[in-house]
């Protein structure tokens, strides 16, 4: 019997992809997975095909921590087309109303100010939120309206950039779960003229730097050049990745001596002096501060592992951040 076929290589890290216009987040995810020959990949919050910009893609063990990027703040640049409302609240939808734009700067300023801070937002029917296991947009395409509960959101910053003709450009820093299309649709109705999103770009996720974004074209060029030169592109591709723990840098660090870390790697909680009183922590090991996973502070003050990094070595058993599976510290 032959050896089972490998699905891909074990590569761990976070790629900041600059998602192109016209492709879905899953489309670009699959392209990145193939280019890296990765065995596992997942994105951290979908962007509509109409949208471009930062889409963090987690490879390998980094997928264990992708949820924390889903829960992080986002920053967007958006252009709203005033005077036209569509059924999807963006340029891809059908026009459902067209009205004149008779809005003063004072009225605009007052309307924008009403969106700053915390509020309740009813998600769009054209969203990926699920109802009975099916995305809302599938119901919407069938002409079915589903009752949606309002959700708490926070707009930390809403910057007025420009207003030329019927195009209004804004920059919005917001909490997780905020639908920019819904903000623009609500703004249009508040102004009495209607509006939809004509341009949307995600500038930032959490604290990731925008200058570390790479495009599909750059990745493809690296692979094609390597193939033409009959060499592996892996080293060049891997240099573009950010560390796995970049997804959880907002958690306090608990640094363990190797002897103590060995217990954590086996799933055992440990007492560590000087830990936070509660909440999630990022666990590192030794003077090198190697990331081994995340944990929580238990009621008795011990650090309890929650998700640990598993390293894969060709021809060997999986290793939990340096300890072979099954070993006892």
From Swiss-Prot:
GO molecular-function term, one example from the UniProt record: RNA binding
One of the GO biological process terms: mRNA pseudouridine synthesis
Domain of life, source organism: Bacteria
Residue ranges of the TM segments: none
EC identifiers of the protein: 5.4.99.25
Active-site residue numbers: 48 (nucleophile)
Keyword Protein biosynthesis: no
Annotated catalysed reactions: uridine(55) in tRNA = pseudouridine(55) in tRNA
UniProt keywords, alphabetically: Isomerase, tRNA processing
SUPFAM superfamilies registered for this protein in UniProt: Pseudouridine synthase, PUA domain-like
Matching CDD domains: PseudoU_synth_EcTruB, PUA_TruB_bacterial
Top-level class of the enzyme under EC nomenclature: isomerase
Annotated substrate binding sites: 43, 76, 179, 200
Function: Responsible for synthesis of pseudouridine from uracil-55 in the psi GC loop of transfer RNAs.
Family: Belongs to the pseudouridine synthase TruB family. Type 1 subfamily.
NCBIfam families membership: TruB
Protein name: tRNA pseudouridine synthase B
Originating organism: Yersinia enterocolitica serotype O:8 / biotype 1B (strain NCTC 13174 / 8081)
Classification lineage: Bacteria, Pseudomonadati, Pseudomonadota, Gammaproteobacteria, Enterobacterales
């Amino acid at each position: 019997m032959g050896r089972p076929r490998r699905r891909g290589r074990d590569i761990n890290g976070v790629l900041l992809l600059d998602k192109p216009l016209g492709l879905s987040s899953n489309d670009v995810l699959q392209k990145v997975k193939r280019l890296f020959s990765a065995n596992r990949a997942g994105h951290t919050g979908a962007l509509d095909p109409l949208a471009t910009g930062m889409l963090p893609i987690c490879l390998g063990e980094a997928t264990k921590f992708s949820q924390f990027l889903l829960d992080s703040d986002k920053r967007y640049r958006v252009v709203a087309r005033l005077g036209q409302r569509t059924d999807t609240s963006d340029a891809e939808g059908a026009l459902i109303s067209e009205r004149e734009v008779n809005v003063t700067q004072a009225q605009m300023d007052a309307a924008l100010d009403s969106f700053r801070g915390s509020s309740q937002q009813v998600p769009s029917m054209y969203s990926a939120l699920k109802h009975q296991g099916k995305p809302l947009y599938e119901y919407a395409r069938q002409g079915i309206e589903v009752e949606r509960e309002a959700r708490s959101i926070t707009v930390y910053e809403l910057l007025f950039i420009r207003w030329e003709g019927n195009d209004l450009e804004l920059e919005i820093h917001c909490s997780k779960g905020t639908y920019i299309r819904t903000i623009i649709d609500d703004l249009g109705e508040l102004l009495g003229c209607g509006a939809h999103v004509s341009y949307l770009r995600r500038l930032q996720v959490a604290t990731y730097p925008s200058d570390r974004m790479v495009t599909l074209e750059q990745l493809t060029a690296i692979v094609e050049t390597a193939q033409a030169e009959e060499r592996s592109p892996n080293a060049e591709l891997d240099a573009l990745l950010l560390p796995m723990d970049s997804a959880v840098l907002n958690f306090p660090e608990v640094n363990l001596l190797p002897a103590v870390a060995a217990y954590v790697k086996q799933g055992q909680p440990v007492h560590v002096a000087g830990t936070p009183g509660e909440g999630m922590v990022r666990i590192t090991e030794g003077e090198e501060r190697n990331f081994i996973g995340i944990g929580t502070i238990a009621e008795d003050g011990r650090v309890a592992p929650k998700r640990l990094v598993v390293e894969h070595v060709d021809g060997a058993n999986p290793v939990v951040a340096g300890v072979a599976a099954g070993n006892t510290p």
